[in-house]
């Protein structure tokens, strides 16, 4: 090997070592703060995890209680948002993938959906407040909170359904249509079965996303310190209670806020891991 080649080889090795070192430092830097956040969350939230947390409602200041009404309110609004947003999102994603795939309208719809996907959640909350809450006499309710969350669910489900259906091999469509079955039956019995894992993953990711939303609920659900299951009345939610209690001067409320944050983090982690595992187990071959 000539002197010039040796010099070039050493230079490339030096650059490669420097790049690897910088990459490792950057990864460790991000990992350090992630571990720090998780450790703080566990150390401050774990002491408040007990049976009362899940069975008692939010207490007055300086008294013991739990977050049962907040858990119930969050569950009701998230369930309503998923029930309303999922069928609409799947239908819209199906139209994009199967009926309007090459049309100019589908390009516009995808563009608008991408904008909605990245829109600040507080804007969606203000939109529902103006469109629905103000026109119902200014009544805050779990239903209006669910409507705000629907606008977060929709773009996720639409994007996931569109992409998963387009990943299904074209030979499956041709084989089904060659048997003489109508297109709607081909979509429901062939394409949906093939893309079911990916679509379900999108729904789970949407659930994980809306479970921690606070901003849109400030203008819609408003909150309620009592036990309530009426969807047309103000209702508590875990993110709203956490936001209120974390900024309070009372130690008991702060402990409940940390405990609620820990429970919410574990829930989102489990849902995200479940969605990832489901997608990896049922991955559609890209052919």
Curated annotation (Swiss-Prot):
Q: Which GO terms describe its biological process?
A: phosphate ion transmembrane transport
Q: Which GO terms describe its cellular component?
A: plasma membrane
Tell me which residues make up the ABC transmembrane type-1 domain.
71-279
UniProt cross-references to InterPro entries, sorted A to Z:
MetI-like (IPR000515), MetI-like_sf (IPR035906), Phosphate_PstA (IPR005672), Phosphate_transprt_permease (IPR051408)
CDD domains for this protein = TM_PBP2
What keywords tag this UniProt record?
Cell inner membrane, Cell membrane, Membrane, Phosphate transport, Transmembrane, Transmembrane helix, Transport
UniProt KW Transmembrane keyword: yes
Question: Transmembrane segments in this chain: where?
Answer: 22-42, 70-90, 115-135, 138-158, 199-219, 255-275
Q: Which GO terms describe its molecular function?
A: phosphate transmembrane transporter activity
* Cellular compartment(s): Cell inner membrane
Record Pfam families = BPD_transp_1 (PF00528)
Q: How would you describe this protein's topology in the membrane? A: Multi-pass membrane protein
Is Isomerase one of the keywords? no
Family per similarity comment:
Belongs to the binding-protein-dependent transport system permease family. CysTW subfamily.
Cited function: Part of a binding-protein-dependent transport system for phosphate; probably responsible for the translocation of the substrate across the membrane.
* PANTHER family recorded: PHOSPHATE TRANSPORT SYSTEM PERMEASE PROTEIN PSTA
Q: Would you tell me the protein name for this molecule? A: Phosphate transport system permease protein PstA
**What is the species listed in this Swiss-Prot or TrEMBL entry?**
Xylella fastidiosa (strain Temecula1 / ATCC 700964)
| Name of the coding gene | pstA
């Amino acid at each position: 090997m000539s002197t010039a080649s040796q010099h070039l080889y050493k230079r490339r090795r030096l650059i490669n070592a420097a790049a690897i070192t910088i990459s490792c430092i950057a990864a460790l830097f991000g990992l350090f703060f992630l571990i720090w956040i998780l450790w703080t969350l566990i150390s401050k939230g774990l002491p408040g995890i007990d049976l009362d947390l899940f069975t008692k409602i939010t207490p007055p200041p300086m008294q013991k209680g739990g977050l049962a009404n907040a858990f119930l309110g969050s569950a009701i609004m998230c369930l309503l948002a998923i029930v309303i947003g999922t069928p609409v999102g799947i239908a819209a994603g199906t139209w994009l993938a199967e009926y309007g795939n090459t049309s100019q309208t589908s390009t516009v719809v995808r563009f608008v959906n991408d904008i909605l996907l990245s829109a600040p959640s507080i804007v969606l909350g203000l939109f529902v407040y103006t469109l629905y809450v103000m026109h119902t006499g200014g009544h805050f309710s779990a239903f209006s909170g669910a409507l705000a969350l629907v606008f977060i669910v929709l773009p996720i489900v639409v994007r996931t359904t569109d992409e998963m259906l387009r990943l299904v091999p074209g030979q499956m469509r041709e084989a089904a249509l060659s048997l003489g079955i109508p297109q709607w039956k081909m979509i429901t019995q062939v394409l949906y079965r093939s893309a079911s894992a990916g679509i379900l993953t999108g729904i789970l990711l949407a659930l994980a996303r809306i479970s921690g939303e606070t901003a849109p609920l400030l203008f819609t659900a408003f909150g309620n310190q009592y036990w309530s299951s009426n969807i047309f009345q103000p209702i508590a939610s875990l993110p709203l209670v956490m936001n209120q209690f974390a900024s309070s001067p009372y130690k008991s409320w702060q402990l409940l806020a940390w405990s609620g944050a820990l429970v919410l983090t574990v829930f989102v982690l489990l849902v995200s891991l479940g969605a990832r595992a489901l997608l990896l187990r049922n991955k559609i071959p890209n052919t």
